[in-house]
Amino acid sequence: MFERIVDGRTDLVFEFLAQGHPANSADDDGVSLIKWCAYYGDVSAIRFLLANGESLESLGENLGLNGAAFHGHWRLCQFLIESGADVNRPLLDTGETPLHAAVCKANRPTYSLVLKVLLANGANPNCVTKASAETSAFMRDARTKAETPLHRAAAFGTEEAIQLLLDAGAKLDAKDMNGDSPLSWASWHLRPDSILRKLCYGGFAIHPGRQATFDHGVGWGALEASLLGTPHV
């Protein structure tokens, strides 16, 4: 039965404990039931384990809030915050906060809900990571760049996610370790003009006639549309 829980049937924790297994049971790799339930965002299963003797601290640093944000589990984020997790606590090795963790995936609407929960509970939109610290947020051979959450949202987030950060006071002119702004990150990642416009600051602007819709290289860009020409028939 544990294998089925590992594969997503976290509802089976009720039956698993009813069979006499302890709430702090773990698989052969030492990953506990509560961590699997957190991985899948099952707050009800977590509450059941807690009621039967498991400890929320076993989820790790800051009650695992960064992980919950990274996986897009807004309900779990809210529960962990209500249980004492700190929305502004950075990871010791990278300086990444839960806000940073919530803007690591491209165009996933669920992360806007996570941002809403974090920001509503006082998350600082202008916190920065450490410089050149190896991060697992992007899985392979990646290092932080002293960036804000808006930098990451500019590269990967939806328009809504970007607007949420801006409304919370995120700085358009924030610079990372290389002197790049969120607009720089959006430009490098080939974001659409609608996003670039949101991120313009100072003397930067996007021509009102530009309506490039490509995102991360997918779709039509302004140059490609222009190169089509206009047939005179």
Task: Show the residue positions of the predicted features.
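Ankyrin-repeat boundary/"N-cap" motif
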Residues: M1, A26-L33, S58-N66, P90-V103, ...
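Ankyrin-repeat-protein effector appendages
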Residues: M1-E3, N121, A168, S187-V233
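N-terminal segments that cap or nucleate solenoid repeat domains
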Residues: M1-S32, W36
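Ankyrin repeat A-helix N-terminal signature
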Residues: E3-G8, W36-D42, G67-H73, A101-Y111, ...
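Structural recognition of alpha-solenoid helical scaffolds
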Residues: L12, G60-G64, T110
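Ankyrin repeat domain, specifically the short helix-to-loop turn at the C-terminus of the second helix
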Residues: F14-P22, R47-S55, Q78-D86, K116-N124, ...
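Solenoidal tandem-repeat scaffolds enriched in leucines and small polar residues
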Residues: L92, R108, L115, N124, ...
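Ankyrin-repeat and related helical/solenoid repeat scaffolds used for protein-protein interactions
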Residues: R143, E147, H151-D193, K198, ...
